[in-house]
């Protein structure tokens, strides 16, 4: 019985470690919106998918600002397709209050975001990793 419990905990630990290893996890700086404001998005696991939560907001001068959107999901239901590609998710644009189907492409410290409506995908810009 002890051996089964230890094996189960070890397997769960390996699965958690594999999930934590996704290279998109971490903090990302968005591109400025139409008002020049930008944010820091924390990408993390949400169950078996990936989501991104707005954790800090900044004004056009780069100073931190208060926002009712802090703590809200900006990206959700994203899944890894391998090779730095992600799809199947949604992205919410707070300044337009619109939600789009989304896909992402990770390349080093750059995360290209696209929002899609009716099969037409629009470049959502390239987010930069925050160290």
Predicted segments, located by residue:
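Short, low-complexity polar/charged micro-motifs in intrinsically disordered terminal tails
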Residues: 12, 126-128
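Sec/Tat signal peptide C-region and signal peptidase I cleavage site
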Residues: 15-21
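Positively charged n-region of N-terminal signal peptides that target proteins for export
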Residues: 1-4
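Bacterial N-terminal signal peptides
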Residues: 7-15
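Short coil-to-beta-strand transition motifs
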Residues: 22, 36, 120-122
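Central antiparallel beta-sheet cores of small beta-barrel/beta-sandwich binding domains
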Residues: 24-101, 128
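Short, exposed beta-strand-loop hairpins at the edges of beta-sheets
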Residues: 94-96, 101-104, 110-124
């Amino acid at each position: 019985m002890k051996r089964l419990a230890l094996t189960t905990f070890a397997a769960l630990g390996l699965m958690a470690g594999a999930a934590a290893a996704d290279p998109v996890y971490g903090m990302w700086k968005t591109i400025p919106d139409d008002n020049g404001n930008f944010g820091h998005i924390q990408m993390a696991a949400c169950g078996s998918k990936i989501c991104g939560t707005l954790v800090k907001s900044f004004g056009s001068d780069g100073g931190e600002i208060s926002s009712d959107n802090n703590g809200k999901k900006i990206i959700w239901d994203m899944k890894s397709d391998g090779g730095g590609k992600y799809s199947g998710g949604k992205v919410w644009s707070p300044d337009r209050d619109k939600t789009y189907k989304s896909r992402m492409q990770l390349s080093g410290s750059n995360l290209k975001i696209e929002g899609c409506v009716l099969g037409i995908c629009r470049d959502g810009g390239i987010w930069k990793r925050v160290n």
